[in-house]
A protein has these predicted regions:
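Substrate-binding groove/exosite segments of carbohydrate-active enzymes
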Residues: 137-266, 272-278, 385, 389
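Recognizes extended acidic, P/S/T-rich segments that occur
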Residues: 58-106, 116-122
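Pro/Thr/Ser/Gly-rich low-complexity, intrinsically disordered linker/stalk tracts
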Residues: 22-54, 132
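Well-ordered alpha-helical scaffold segments within catalytic/enzyme domains
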Residues: 184-195, 233-249, 295-312, 350-360, ...
Length: 544
């Protein structure tokens, strides 16, 4: 099935998508992840989003025009840049192709796109930037449902995240928090705000405070360090690559992260979880040695993924070796003969399942034990366990339990440990089903997890990714059916996993899925219909 889906995703890229509808236009112009900023660099990187009412539209070339005044640009003259290429598909972080820029210089620019029919589209609306370093915080998401409790949790989370970002942008360098607090909020920052600039600045501040051995501090400017906080130095470059699509910044940080991990291995070569830095602990008493070995497993897993943007295919062998040794040490020390964990806390179960320390055949017993504990005791974790709870339930297919726990238990102190700790990430990626399967959301996986509970009847969400706006909206119908609408940005392909029984009838915009343009059925199971969608907006109806 995976190979079939991969072939289906690649097929339009290889043969070229059929163009449907109107010409393509550039919109959402930005510079180094900022809209009309006072830019931080004399070598700015320019981005735009493709807009078209047609389906399957793609960029084949681009024409960048930049001028020192709005009047010159309006006359279609580029005294700073006039770059025209008929074979340039880059639309995200396009390098500056004009004259050298100076600090304080004001630049007005626009772009037009050459599509697959070799037709130039209209000029974009003009944008501008000034060569000086600022930070601006703008929203990039929306979420609502019929359930007030979920909506209120979303609103509280957004207010908390926005307050931290705005205080940091205003000069309060402690506002984002420790490394642990930042990494727990990283995906939420990216999903809900144009947060690349402040998070990159925070990462640079962490790097400026590295110890001589290469350890990241607990927070910028501090001297202490530990396994929980230091993992921020690895997670932030990964997020820059995967969520913001910035492989150049991720590549730049490879030697820094590598020095840090090699220092950890040198201190604890047998990966026993030996205490390093300041002692760490959790609210439920999970031992620090257990935490150390699991968090090293997580760091190693992310490092293997970072090897792709860093272009380090040979060095990844080191981290495969680390992973095998970490796994063996964990299993020797913490797995009982019957396959259960010797540490019987919910945090211990969550870390074991998320941190690459178990073999696949060892996971189900740990999952069953965790689910049993959650059903009997409710949520019994602190901030570290909360970071992993909803992702683990999502990845193990326990979506109804995740919704039940959020709906029943997130109040008071329990709610507080989830605010800014992955809650809106779960709403957007699980409930709304918006996920990327390529860096920078160049390909999507739309997979809404619709709870069986009758309390939640519909969800509507959008995310303004670096590749354009992604929309997802599902609604349960009274007859047991489902309506699902979505928008896939121009230049992007999506894999859709639509909840539908095998005998259900599925239509898109009133047509069969075989007749609908831009829709390709890959396969159907007893519970799901899998499609590949070209760019465009779609309205599916599922009738039982």
């Amino acid at each position: 099935m995976k190979r079939a889906i991969a072939r289906a995703l690649l097929f339009p890229l290889i043969l070229g998508a059929t163009a449907f509808g109107s010409p393509i236009k550039a919109t959402g112009l930005s510079v180094d992840h900022q809209v009309n900023p006072v830019a931080a660099s004399t070598s700015p990187r320019l981005s735009w989003i493709l807009e078209s009412e047609g389906r399957g539209k793609r960029q084949f070339g681009c024409h960048l025009l930049a001028a020192g005044s709005a009047e010159t640009l309006a006359a279609d003259k580029g005294d700073l840049c006039d770059y025209k290429a008929e074979s340039d598909t880059t639309r995200h972080l396009h390098k500056w192709m004009g004259k050298p820029l100076k600090a304080g210089q004001e630049v007005h620019w626009k772009v037009r796109i050459l599509d697959e029919s070799k037709t130039w589209g209209e000029w974009s609306a003009p944008a501008k930037f000034i060569v000086k370093p600022p930070l601006s915080i703008t929203r990039t998401s929306g979420f609502e449902s019929n359930l007030d409790q979920i909506n209120n949790l979303y609103a509280e989370s957004i207010a908390h995240l926005e307050s931290r970002l705005k205080k940091y942008a205003a000069g309060d360098h402690q506002a984002l928090g420790t490394g642990a607090q930042v990494q727990r909020s990283t995906k939420e920052f990216y999903y809900n705000f144009d947060a690349t600039a402040p998070l990159l600045q925070y990462l640079q501040a962490l790097e400026s405070s590295l110890t001589e051995e290469g350890h990241y501090p607990a927070a910028p400017g501090q001297n202490n360090y530990n396994a929980i906080d230091s993992n921020a130095g690895i997670i932030l470059p990964y997020a820059l690559w995967w969520l913001a699509g910035d492989d150049a910044e991720a590549k730049k940080r490879w030697p820094i992260v590598e020095k840090h991990l090699m220092a950890r291995e040198k201190f604890d070569p047998k990966f026993t979880g030996k205490q390093w830095g300041t002692e760490i602990s959790t609210a439920d008493g999970t031992p620090p040695e257990y935490l150390n070995i699991c968090l090293m497993g997580m760091a190693t897993r992310i490092m293997r993924q970072l090897s792709f943007p860093a272009e380090q295919p040979l060095n990844v062998i080191r981290y495969k070796d680390y992973a095998l040794r970490i796994k063996k040490s964990f299993q020797d020390n913490y797995l009982a003969e019957d396959g259960s964990l010797k540490i019987n806390t919910q945090t211990a179960h969550l870390l074991a399942l998320r941190c690459a320390v178990l073999d696949p055949e060892q996971q189900q017993g740990i999952i069953d034990s965790l689910i049993d504990s959650l059903k009997k005791e409710g949520i019994k974790v602190g901030t570290l366990g909360a970071e992993y709870l909803l992702p683990v339930l999502y990845l193990t297919g326990n979506h109804d339990l995740a919704f039940e726990l959020v709906e029943k238990h997130l109040s008071g102190e329990t709610k507080n440990i989830f605010i800014g700790n992955g809650l809106t990430d779960w709403m957007l990626t699980s409930l709304a089903g918006i996920n990327g399967i390529q860096p920078g959301f160049q390909q999507l996986h739309l997979k809404p997890q619709i709870p069986a509970s009758n309390k939640i009847k519909w969800v509507k969400a959008h995310y303004d990714s670096v590749s354009g706006r992604i929309e997802s909206h599902w609604k349960k119908e009274d007859n047991g059916g489902l309506t699902f609408s979505c928008t896939v940005p121009p230049g992007v392909l999506a894999q859709l996993a639509l909840p539908a029984a095998k005998k259900a009838t599925i239509t898109e915009s009133g047509k069969t899925t075989k007749e609908a343009q831009g829709v390709e059925l890959v396969n159907r199971s007893d519970t799901t219909a899998n499609f590949v969608l070209q760019s465009g907006s779609y309205q599916f109806v599922v009738k039982p």
